[in-house]
A protein has these predicted regions:
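Sequence/structural signature of outer-membrane beta-barrel proteins
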Residues: 27-34, 66-70, 100, 156-160, ...
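Active-site glycine- and acidic-residue-rich loops that bind
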Residues: 127, 181-189, 222-231
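Outer-membrane beta-barrel transmembrane domain signature
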Residues: 111-112, 121, 158-183
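Short coil-to-helix leader/linker segments, especially the first N-terminal amphipathic alpha-helix
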Residues: 1-9
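Outer membrane beta-barrel
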Residues: 9-159, 186-191, 195-203
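A short secondary-structure junction signal
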Residues: 147-149, 160-166, 217-218
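Detector for outer-membrane/organellar transmembrane beta-barrel domains
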Residues: 15, 196-260
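Loop-centered beta-sheet repeat module
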Residues: 168-217
Length: 260
């Protein structure tokens, strides 16, 4: 299932309850736009290191450190702890991946055969999106189905959605390093996903994300209206014999000042 994706990774070396792994993703590209090309280009897009440890019978820790485009961007993409009450109720806290669609959770390069990431996951859903927070997730298995749920409160996206160098609305610009230290408005964002899977058919999931993105008060004084960003997504994986078909659709709504 999509939910368990962060634990289904290429771990290469294990010792006791701890495992270390990772992957590197390099591309050679030749692009042409309107008959014009800049020739051949090569890049080391990502170099990722994973660390996992089962601390005890109920506690699991996992993390991911990513080097993107060489050392242009270095990010701690995941660093979370799971406390397993039972498989149907797991408490999670740390730097986590909000479950908006399937790709934001299962985005590792070795899983896919394509060079570029899906447009819906970069132009609408700002994958890869990591946020600090906590919540619960779990899995149930009634009558041959596997049902899963995730629900988290996180710091959320920031004012870069509207105030950015692109001069337009851009959800990816709402990501900033400051969001790992504090929430810019003190109102956590809510993200949630529910999904159903049948082993011989596939999986379908429905996701929701909503949070206030602007700083609407200063020193306790309200200085602006609250403005929120909302995302809805549906993801589908259909297994037809040896073929697996995957798709994802998303819609975003952003509240902006009346002057815009």
């Amino acid at each position: 299932m999509v939910q368990g994706g962060i634990y289904q990774r290429p771990f290469l070396v294990s010792a006791g309850r701890t495992a270390v792994g990772g992957y590197a993703e390099g591309h050679a590209e030749y692009a042409k736009t309107d008959g014009v090309t800049e020739g051949l280009s090569m890049a080391l897009r990502r170099f990722n290191i994973f660390l996992f440890s089962s601390v005890g019978r109920r506690i699991r820790f996992t993390s991911e450190l990513e080097f993107e485009n060489g050392t242009e961007e270095i990010a701690l993409e995941t660093a979370l702890v799971d406390f397993v009450v039972n498989p149907s109720f797991v408490i999670r806290a740390g730097i986590l991946l909000p479950p908006i669609g399937a790709f934001n959770v299962n985005h590792d390069g070795p899983r896919y055969d394509f060079v570029e990431r899906p447009l819906v996951s970069t132009q609408i859903i700002p994958a890869t999106l990591s946020e600090v927070g906590g919540g619960v997730h779990g899995r149930l298995a009634p009558r041959g189905l596997s049902l899963s749920y995730d629900a988290y409160l996180t710091n959320g996206l920031g004012e870069g959605i509207l105030l950015n160098s692109l001069g337009r609305l851009d959800l990816a610009s709402g990501k900033s390093e400051e969001r790992f230290a504090e929430d810019n408005n003190g109102e956590p964002a809510l993200s949630a996903r529910v999904a159903a899977q049948r082993r011989d058919l596939g999986e379908i999931g429905f996701s929701f994300y909503r949070g206030t993105y602007n700083s609407f008060r200063t020193d306790g004084v309200v200085v602006d209206d609250k403005r929120a960003v909302s995302l809805l997504a549906v993801d589908l994986r259909a297994d037809v014999g040896p073929v697996s078909l995957q798709g994802e659709a998303a819609a975003a709504a952003v509240e902006v000042p009346e002057s815009l």
